[in-house]
């Protein structure tokens, strides 16, 4: 409720999302919760989840190496905690919120030679932020900040499929089937363009690598 914003600093406490996550884990592993260390042992997959430490204003990475005993559900709950919409998460005496506040496109943690990044970008050319409430101001600022962060890190990987002309709000959770199909078609369009341009991208990447090696040798 709106009263929850003033009492607990967010509209939703995220309990429903946690219930859904627990159901998935119960169905997959027949347990109610799972730590990063347990997940890695069972799957041999290195899961990284980004959160923002609001208390100390820094980006943190949750994984089986950094936080082996942390609940994966807690990490996911942190990563989805959009300010105002969800209450912050108290973990290790610090408050945490959505990782996108500090890094909305954490491609830097991936192998840039083997990772394909999908970057769904709002079209700022058609952006028309309006102020109708305190929430609209917060969301507008969050979108601007996130777009700036994205541009800062996007050069770190040559294999990024950038999907432009996306015109939906980041907190629009009520997607219709028609909207989902339009987004899929948009992704297919830009994926084909990416594949067509890939040989040129690879050549440029190789040339840049050679230049870097020569400069380092000199």
Q: Where does each model-flagged region fall?
A:
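Patatin-like phospholipase
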Residues: 1-218
């Amino acid at each position: 409720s709106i009263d929850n914003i003033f009492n607990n600093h967010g509209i939703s406490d995220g309990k429903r999302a946690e219930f859904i996550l627990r159901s998935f884990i119960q169905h997959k592993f027949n347990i109610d919760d799972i730590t990063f260390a347990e997940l890695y042992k069972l799957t041999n997959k290195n899961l990284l989840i980004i959160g923002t430490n609001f208390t100390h204003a820094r980006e943190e990475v949750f994984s089986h190496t950094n936080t082996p005993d942390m609940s994966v559900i807690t990490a996911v709950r942190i990563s989805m905690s959009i300010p105002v919409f969800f209450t912050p998460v108290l973990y290790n005496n610090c408050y945490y919120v959505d990782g996108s506040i500090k890094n909305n496109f954490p491609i830097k943690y991936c192998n840039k030679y083997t990772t394909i990044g999908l970057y769904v970008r709002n079209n700022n050319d058609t952006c028309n932020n309006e102020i109708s409430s305190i929430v609209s101001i917060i969301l507008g600022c969050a979108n601007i900040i996130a777009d700036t962060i994205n541009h800062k890190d996007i050069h770190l990987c040559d294999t990024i499929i950038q999907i432009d002309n996306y015109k939906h709000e980041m907190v629009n959770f009520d997607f219709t089937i028609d909207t989902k199909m339009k987004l899929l078609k948009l992704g297919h369009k830009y994926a084909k363009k990416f594949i067509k341009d890939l040989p040129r991208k690879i050549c440029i990447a190789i040339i840049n690598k050679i230049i870097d090696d020569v400069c380092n040798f000199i």
